[in-house]
A protein has these predicted regions:
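A sequence-level/structural motif corresponding to short, flexible coil/turn segments enriched
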Residues: 1-250
């Protein structure tokens, strides 16, 4: 759906599969030419595509007038979900999310792996990266800096870097060619309150998940998400708190 700056609706587009299929959009990005990119998933086959498995990743490009330019559907024989999308200065598109299988000949590390896929502006796939542990990982946000390095945030239940326990937030940096530059993993520890049945406090692991990432003009990286604990000396005020973490360009 598009509105102009005066809040007047310009157009509405609806992407439909078969009567028995389920489609969902999760991510949205706009390039320098005002083309629009939507990432999500489907359990059917769209635009003549055949479903690879249970759920497939979707990437759709529209022009500024709302005309569909192309649609890409891809996945493994299992569940694959596109959750975020962004565009670099050259019009290349990056999609992240998670897969329960292996994409483009890659092997799944465990339950769920993070993926990062790059397409050019014409919709031709350039490369696929897949990363995981024997447990669970998800990619929830993707950003691109002025040098076209790519940053992915999400979470892991395993050890990609230093493991704090439970679900840890992560941020990954890839260069333009898809080579991973570094991984940062961080989390908190939370405490269970005393109960009427057990008067001793118990330490438990915290669920910490990165959901969004952005880069400023100096190359600093900002990650936001939620935590059940207290990060870097902060005190948790309830069940889930918002966090904001800044990294330098490294």
């Amino acid at each position: 759906m598009k509105y102009n700056s005066s809040e007047t609706k310009q157009w509405v587009k609806q992407l439909e599969g078969s009567s028995k299929s389920f489609e969902n959009s999760q991510g949205l990005a706009v390039d320098s030419s005002d083309n629009i990119y939507v990432a999500g998933f489907t359990n059917g086959g769209l635009d003549g595509n055949t479903s690879s498995g249970k759920h497939d990743i979707l990437l759709v490009k529209y022009n500024s007038g709302g005309s569909k330019q192309w649609l890409q559907q891809f996945g493994s024989s299992k569940n694959d979900f596109g959750l975020a999308v962004n565009v670099d200065s050259k019009g290349n598109i990056y999609v992240t999310g998670y897969t329960e299988g292996g994409l483009d000949g890659k092997t799944n590390s465990g339950e769920r792996d993070i993926f990062l896929v790059k397409y050019n502006s014409s919709g031709t796939k350039q490369w696929t990266q897949q990363l995981g542990t024997p447990t669970f990982e998800e990619g929830n946000g993707v950003a691109v800096d002025s040098s076209d390095n790519i940053y992915v945030t999400g979470w892991t239940r395993g050890k990609l870097d230093t493991y704090a326990g439970g679900d840890d937030a992560i941020v990954l940096k890839y260069n333009y060619s898809g080579t991973k530059q570094w991984t940062r993993q961080f989390g908190a520890t939370s405490f269970l309150e005393k109960s009427q049945y057990n008067q001793s406090s118990q330490m438990t692991t915290s669920a910490d998940k990165g959901t969004g990432v952005a880069v400023d003009s100096s190359g600093n990286i900002y990650v936001t998400g939620s935590t059940e604990g207290g990060m870097d000396g902060n005190t948790n005020s309830g069940k889930n708190d918002i966090f904001l973490v800044k990294y330098n360009s490294m």
